[in-house]
Amino acid sequence: MENRERAGAGAVGSAGSLGLRVGQAVFSSASLLFMSVGVEFFSYTAFCFLVTIMGLVIPWSCTLAMIDVYSILVGCPLRVPGVMVIVVIGDWVLAILSLAAASSSAAVIDLLLQFHGSHCSPRFCGRYQLSAMMAFLSWFLTAASSLFNLWFIASR
């Protein structure tokens, strides 16, 4: 029984999963907010990509957080193998896309800062840096969630 509880610690339907999903939603929302505050982000494809991916992560995380809340309240965690595979694949795809978006945005920000602010005002570049940092944190939580759920599937 103890191994099953450990295997399901971060799997869908557990309190650990709820914490991961809330963290994903918070960091993705913060990344989207910091990027969208400046209207200039439309000029760079990497920033548009980041906004698009964070816009996908937010509803995915919120939906799975609602499933986690329901599973915790009812006391019956969602352990259907087919659904777990879909969650793992969705997390995996979003984790890869989040990493790509955060990395490309960070690279563009670094390039803009190389020009000593001639292409990006310090106020906007600071916001873009915060947005990329929040996207990296969201990616980390999404990847962790994917690994926890994959571990649960493999342990069954």
From Swiss-Prot:
Broad class of the protein's primary localization: membrane
Cellular component aspect of the GO annotation: membrane; plasma membrane
Keyword Cell membrane: yes
Compartment list: Cell membrane
Top-rank lineage group of the source organism: Eukaryota
Residues spanning the membrane: 22-42, 47-67, 82-102, 133-153
Family matches, as InterPro entries: CASP_dom, CASPL-5
Extracellular side: 43-46, 103-132
Intrachain disulfide bonds: none
Topological domain spans for side Cytoplasmic: 1-21, 68-81, 154-156
Record key words, sorted: Cell membrane, Membrane, Transmembrane, Transmembrane helix
Keyword Membrane in record: yes
Topology in membrane: Multi-pass membrane protein
Known partners and oligomeric status: Homodimer and heterodimers.
Family to which the UniProt record says this protein belongs: Belongs to the Casparian strip membrane proteins (CASP) family.
Protein name: CASP-like protein 5C1
